[in-house]
Design a protein with these regions (language model features):
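Non-catalytic positions within long, well-ordered alpha-helices that form the structural scaffold/packing
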Residues: 324, 393-396, 596, 600, ...
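Conserved active-site alpha-helix within GNAT-family acetyltransferase domains
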Residues: 611-630
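Conserved acetyl-CoA-binding loop-helix of GNAT-fold acetyltransferases
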Residues: 579-599
């Protein structure tokens, strides 16, 4: 292992490019020389080895003569999955525990090991289950993996999934958020011995779970070891066979429509069960949460974005106020369709009017809106889906900031199976699906980001429907073949990603403006001559008359503008590190200054920013002061 590191360092000193192809050659050559299994020298093991030597054997590390610049280059070579932090932050996704759902959609999976709509084989769900759905344990596991893969973890976006957030008891919501912050504040990073999938590449997730249970105590952060033992003592299983057998009887009844998901979840996770026992201590006060938030303002791992998901009918002023106090900055909202007939026959139990109100409220509260939109629902057609999506992107009541657009897939146990067997629903052909998605990308405006085109379902879980994980690539190939690639404006297609940006070539584009029923929106973006995006800001100028008329529901006054998002792209740089990527070169500050000027010129007396907990210090340095749910600056 050491010799490979030394060979990489020598190549870098000589000015050679060490890309993945060159690294594989170095690994294979060393494996042959040592007569070793090349899996034992895999890329994913090199960085943890380097980090361990630097931390535990300083004399040995000093002999390698690695200065700061050489180390930066080395880490760039050894970093696993660089796309993970290409958007500028490191993302950690966590899953809440199974809980009764206020909806019962026709297409929704009913996996009793998971919260509604999720499957236990999805990567984030499998990790959550191995960690007893505990927020502290989940963050520790992901923080460990990201650190050992070489990613900067100073800036974290937390994504909390699990269906409708507001369905959970308020005490659980507060506890869950408090534990997320606590894990980051504690720097709960385990050693390689506590990350079996890294130490032994290729093993199954189930085997990794068993190895983790046997990890030496000193390999785990103290709270992790204590918490895992607490769940074990309560009888919470993490073994795959136990997990499957524990729900088998109830799952069989749900799959054949004898009883329902909610009834079964109450029996499996309610009072009188091991989960009912641990629920007694899964609660926290708002004061405890706020203490963890204050610590996180200057912590090593700061929360720069916090996301929950919900349904439009659960979006109320009261719910949004609580969500904001918890520290949230973005809401994922299941829309699925704007066709009321489709919503009804797919049993969504929501109306288009509720969707409109949810969007207006979320905007006025300052949240970023990340919508879920589905194709190929029961009753849908390709042409109808195209019209529906275009309406979603262009009608002023909607126009989300971000969207997941993905095709409906048939999952065993969902009530859609009966429709399929009766011939009432069929999946689109690949050609139909690519045609719809290609049209959808083209009509997506410059202020919107298409974050996903597929769910993270395993192909084994999909009975019929798209099973190709590279669907987005196929769609982009279709666009290129049609000659439409140059017309794509959506954000993800234009991100500078892992590439650097020539700051001298960037210009501030202020041309993207649009109106909603309650705001005038300004989308400011730093762009390259080729149209690539290096950073952006979302500015909302609320309708003064509307805000005044709804003063009892809203946390702001008619004289307050709102910055809903500031984001600078490029490989995530550590706080204070002046790297080559676009971050930390004042682009965000310039965006904020321009937004303040626009709001001032429009006659607003104050401007709010929906700051994440970990960005409060940044905005204070820009002249903002704490003001109830936001940070505020006088104009």
């Amino acid at each position: 292992m050491e010799q490979i590191i030394l060979n990489i360092l020598e190549a870098l000193r000589c000015g050679e490019t060490v890309d993945d192809k060159a690294l594989v050659k170095l690994i294979h050559a060393e494996a042959r020389r040592e007569g070793a299994d090349k899996r034992d020298l895999a890329k994913r093991r090199l960085l943890p080895f380097y980090q361990r030597v630097k931390r535990e054997e300083p004399a040995r590390w000093a002999g390698w003569n690695v200065d700061a610049e050489l180390e930066r280059q080395l880490l760039q070579v050894l970093r696993m999955k660089p796309r993970r932090t290409a958007s500028g932050v490191a993302t950690i996704t966590v899953i809440t525990k199974p809980w009764p759902c206020s909806g019962d959609c026709l297409f929704c999976p009913n996996d009793l090991r998971m919260p509604k709509s999720y499957l236990h084989a999805e990567p984030a769900c499998a990790r959550a289950e191995q960690n007893c759905f505990d927020p502290y344990l989940q963050v520790s596991a992901r923080l460990t993996a990201l650190s050992q893969m070489g990613h900067a973890t100073d800036k974290i976006e937390l994504i909390v999934l699990g269906g409708t957030w507001s369905d959970y008891p308020q005490g659980y919501q507060t506890w869950f958020m408090s534990e997320l912050f606590r894990a980051l504040n504690d720097d709960a990073v385990a050693s390689v011995a506590a990350n079996p999938m890294l130490a032994r590449p290729g093993i199954s997730r189930a085997e990794a779970g068993r190895l983790l249970d046997d990890a030496p105590a000193d390999a785990l952060p103290p709270v992790v070891a204590e918490r895992r033992e607490r769940y074990r003592a309560a009888g919470i299983a993490t073994d795959e066979a136990e997990l499957a057998s524990g729900v088998a009887g109830e799952q069989e009844r749900v799959d054949v429509a004898v009883g329902g998901y909610n009834r079964a979840v109450r029996r499996l996770y309610g009072p009188g069960t091991p989960w009912g026992e641990v629920a007694e201590w899964q609660a926290a006060t708002m004061e405890e949460l706020e203490r963890q938030q204050r610590i996180n303002e200057t912590a090593k791992h700061r929360v720069v974005g916090l996301v929950i998901e919900t349904r439009p009918d659960a979006v109320t002023p009261q719910a949004l106020t609580l969500i904001r106090r918890l520290g949230c900055t973005k809401i994922q909202m299941g829309i699925q369709s704007l066709d009321q007939h489709l919503l009804d026959i797919n049993e969504r139990r929501i109306s288009v009017a509720q969707i409109e109100r949810a969007f207006s409220l979320a905007r006025l509260f300052g949240f970023k809106i990340h919508a879920h939109f589905m194709l190929n629902l029961l009753g849908a057609t390709p042409d109808g889906d195209k019209r529906d999506y275009e309406r979603f992107m262009t009608e002023d009541a909607f126009m989300p900031d971000e969207v997941k657009v993905y095709p409906c897939a048939l999952i065993e146990g969902s009530r859609l199976v009966g429709c399929y067997e009766r011939g009432e629903w069929r999946p689109y052909t690949e050609d139909e699906l690519l045609d719809v998605l290609a049209d959808d990308i083209v009509v997506t405006p410059a202020f919107c980001r298409i974050s996903r085109m597929i769910r993270d379902f395993s192909s084994d879980d999909i009975m019929v429907g798209n099973k190709k994980p590279n669907l987005r690539q196929l769609v982009e190939n279709r666009l290129a073949a049609r000659g439409d690639g140059a017309t794509v404006r959506e954000i993800r297609y234009r991100e500078i990603s892992t590439a650097g940006a020539d700051l001298d070539e960037l210009t501030l584009d202020e041309e993207v403006t649009y109106e909603t029923p309650v705001t005038r929106e300004r989308f400011l973006q730093w762009v390259t001559p080729e149209g690539k995006i290096a950073g952006f800001l979302r500015l909302s100028l609320p309708d003064r008359a509307f805000v005044a008329a709804h003063a009892d529901e809203l946390p702001t006054t008619p004289e307050e503008a709102m910055i809903r998002e500031v984001h600078v792209y490029g490989m995530a740089a550590r706080v204070g590190d002046q790297g080559q990527a676009a971050q930390h070169h004042g682009l965000g500050r310039l965006l904020v200054e321009r937004a303040c000027q626009i709001a001032r010129d429009a006659g607003y007396a104050h401007i709010n920013v929906i700051s994440a907990i970990g960005t409060r210090e940044y905005y204070r340095h820009l002249g903002f002061c704490d003001h109830d749910l936001y940070l505020q600056k006088e104009l």
